[in-house]
């Protein structure tokens, strides 16, 4: 009897386990099917909404850019300045910018303890000096180089270093409108109490110390900028992210107390998150370094080493252009692409008849040794249609995402449009803009 009961129990247990297993498999299939449907649905939405950010691991990202049937329904996102245009140059370069970093390398916090900026890789500092000498866009002699996680961190470090530490009131930070849209947000982000955003430099009239951010060429409108306030007690920070030959004529080496640069817009490697500052005053440099030390305990060595290699290749391409290694320099290639993009944009604006763009006077470029026009990284577009007050919303209705003028301290008739996206995205934008009629 006991044997029968034990056998019955075993059979019953086995039946229950099989039932549970089958139920689990069934539920898993339903969940997988539902998840797959959700992913497919989400992928379609993402594909429609973010044309500028395809997955780099997907076959479509590696394949040549072609117009798909869905292209006309896609939203062209040119709100941001993601410099993927430069992939056209770097892909054919092959292994020229490839570096190998062994697992034991870059383990220490310290890069060069003999350098004021102790976390800066010596090779990166060397290539910074070299690229400025090759291009002729900045004086490096008598300057301390400070590396940062992009020029954004360096701007915050500069504000920290230049703000009085013993004042009962925060120092005012200004920039002439239209100013870079992130300046107000960055200045007031942590509400530090040592500095505050005070708006448009053109209307700043307080008789007190101030910091003026001078962006030249300017983001968003592309014009060459000079200080606006020009009063006693003023401190200047020059943001020169776009002072490179593909965007503007290089007229003279920048000789400022504090200048900011970044690889994001110079070479297109925004993902490296690397920038640098050229600082004349050693005490200001020390305080900037202290900020970065407190903020991130230095800057990624791996990114610095890769950035150094990229800058080295750019300099090599300039010095060896026309040879067997480099048929043309990086800046010649980039300038040609920007020239064509601006030509297409001006033609599209003319055909539409609803918009206008800034006009730039040609100037002599020492790098190209020629008189050239300005072709900024962003287009500052104005909607001239009488019944359209919000150009950003108007273009959104035509599936074009831009950044409206209110973010830059001016009216909503203006928008900023990135000129640096991939060719497929840019061509779709031009096609769509050309078709807008009154």
Residue ranges of predicted features:
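PLP-dependent class I/II
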Residues: 2-438
């Amino acid at each position: 009897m006991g044997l029968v009961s034990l056998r019955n129990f075993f059979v019953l247990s086995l039946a229950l386990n099989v039932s549970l297993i089958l139920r689990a498999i069934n539920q898993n299939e339903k969940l997988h099917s539902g998840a797959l449907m959700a992913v497919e649905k989400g992928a379609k939405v993402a594909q429609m909404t973010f044309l500028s950010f395809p997955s780099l691991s997907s076959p479509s990202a590696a394949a040549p850019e072609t117009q798909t049937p869905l292209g006309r329904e896609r939203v062209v996102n040119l709100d941001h300045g993601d410099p993927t245009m430069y992939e056209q140059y770097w892909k054919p370069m092959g292994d020229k910018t490839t570096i190998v970093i062994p697992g034991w390398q870059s383990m220490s916090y310290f890069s060069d303890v003999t350098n004021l900026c102790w976390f800066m890789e010596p090779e990166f500092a060397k290539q910074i000096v070299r690229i400025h000498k090759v291009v002729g866009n900045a004086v490096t002699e008598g300057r301390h180089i400070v590396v940062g996680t992009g020029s954004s961190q360096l701007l915050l470090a500069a504000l920290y270093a230049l703000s009085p530490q013993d004042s009962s009131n925060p120092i005012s930070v200004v920039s002439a409108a239209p100013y870079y849209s992130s300046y107000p947000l960055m200045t007031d982000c942590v509400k530090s109490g040592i500095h505050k955003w005070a708006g448009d430099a053109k209307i700043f009239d307080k008789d007190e110390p101030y910091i003026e951010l001078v962006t030249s060429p300017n983001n968003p409108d592309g014009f060459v900028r000079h200080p606006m306030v020009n009063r006693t007690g003023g401190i200047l920070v020059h943001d020169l992210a776009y002072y490179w030959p593909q965007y503007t004529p290089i007229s003279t080496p920048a000789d400022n107390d504090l200048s900011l640069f970044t690889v994001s817009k110079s070479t297109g490697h925004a993902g490296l998150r690397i920038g640098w500052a050229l600082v004349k005053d050693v005490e200001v440099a020390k305080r900037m370094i202290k900020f970065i030390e407190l903020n991130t305990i230095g800057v990624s060595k791996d990114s610095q080493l890769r950035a150094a290699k990229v800058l080295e290749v750019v300099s090599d391409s300039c010095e060896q252009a026309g040879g067997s290694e480099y048929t043309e320099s990086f800046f010649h290639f980039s300038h040609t692409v920007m020239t064509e993009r601006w030509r297409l944009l001006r033609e599209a604006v003319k055909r539409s008849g609803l918009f206008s763009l800034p006009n730039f006077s040609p100037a002599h470029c020492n790098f190209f040794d020629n008189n050239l026009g300005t072709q900024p990284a962003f287009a500052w577009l104005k909607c001239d249609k009488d019944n359209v007050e919000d150009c950003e919303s108007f273009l959104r209705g035509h599936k074009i995402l831009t950044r409206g003028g209110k973010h830059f301290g001016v009216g909503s008739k203006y928008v900023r449009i990135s000129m640096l996206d991939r060719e497929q995205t840019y061509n779709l934008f031009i096609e769509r803009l050309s078709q807008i009629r009154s």
